[in-house]
Amino acid sequence: MDIQQQTRGFRYFYISVWRFILHLKARLIDDQINIRAGHLAYVTLLSLVPMIAVTMSMLSAFPVFKGIRVNIESLVYSYFLPAAGDSAQVYINEFVNNASKGTFVGIIALLVVAILLISAIDKALNNIWRTTEKRSLVVSFSMYWMVLTLGPVLMGSSLVATSYVVSLELFSQSELSGLLPWLVERLPMLFSVASILLLYMVVPTQKVRFFHALLGAVVAALLFEAGKRAFAYYVTQFPSYEAIYGALATIPILFVWVYLSWMIVLVGAEITAALPEYLDDPFEKDGTKATTALTENKEVDESEPNQGNDTIA
C-alpha cells in the first residue's frame, strides 16, 4: 500500500510539473517575451552609460566607497558582459568619463534617460503580472529615484561588508581556509539571486509571494549563469562576429547578450507570476483530480476501439 501511494504521489508530481510547463509555455507565447526582451535590450543600451554614470557618481559621494569602485566595475563587466568585457569596458568607461564632465542640463538628461530604463522594466513586469492598478506619478517617480540613489549605495555596502567579513581572522584559520574561495566564487551567483528576487518583489504593483519570487529568481540566476558560460564559449570559440564586424564586433555582441539577459529575467518573472495562477486553480488543489482525469481519458481511449469492433460485429 505504501509503495502504491508513493508511486501515485510521484505520478501526480510529474503530471503537475508537466501541466505547469504547458501553462508556462502558453503564458510565454501570449506575453511575447521575445518582443519585450528586445524592447528592454534597446532601452538598456540607450540607458547603459547614463546608469553607470549615475551609479559611479552616487558612489563617489561617499568616501567609504572610493576604494571599491574598481571592484564594482570588475564585477559588472565580468558578470554582465561575458567575453566582451575587456573591449566594452574601455569604451563604456570613456563614455562615462565624458558624460560626467557635462553641464547641469546634461546631467538632468542622463537622469531622465536612466529613469526611462527603470520605467520600461516597470511596465514590462507589470504586464507579465496582468496588473491593472497603476502607481501615481509621485509614487512612480519616488520609486525610480530610490532605485537610482539607494541601489548603488546598497551595492557598495554589500561589497564593503563582504570584504570585511572575509578578512576576519575566522576565515584565516586552517579549518575554514578552504571556505573562503568557495564563498568568493559564489558571491556573483548570490548577488544575482538577491537582485532578481528584489526585482520580482518590489516592481509589480500587486503582492508577490516570497517563495514564488525566490523560486523564479533562483531559476533565472541559474539560467543566467548557464547562459553566461555558453555565450562566452560561443564568442571565444566561434568568433564569427569579429570576422564580420571587425573592430565593431563589441556592439552586436553586447546587444545579443543584453537581449538574452532580459529573456532570462522575463522567463523568471513568468514563472513567478504563473505559480499562483496554477496553484490556486481549483482543479490543481485536489491532488487526485489530475490523476483521475488522466485515468478516465485513458480508459475512454482504450474503450473506443472495442466499441467500434462491437458495432461491426
Curated annotation (Swiss-Prot):
Pfam families: Virul_fac_BrkB
Presence of the UniProt keyword Transmembrane helix in the record: yes
NCBIfam families: PRK01637.1 (NF002457), yihY_not_rbn (TIGR00765)
Transmembrane segments: 45-65, 102-122, 136-156, 183-203, 207-227, 247-267
Main location: membrane
Gene Ontology cellular component terms for the protein in this record: plasma membrane
Top-level taxon of the source organism: Bacteria
Keywords: Cell inner membrane, Cell membrane, Membrane, Transmembrane, Transmembrane helix
Keyword Cell membrane attributed: yes
Family label: Belongs to the UPF0761 family.
Disulfide bonds: none
The name this protein goes by in its record: UPF0761 membrane protein Sden_3448
Location of this chain's protein in the cell: Cell inner membrane
Membrane topology, as annotated: Multi-pass membrane protein
Organism: Shewanella denitrificans (strain OS217 / ATCC BAA-1090 / DSM 15013)
Region Disordered, residue ranges: 290-313
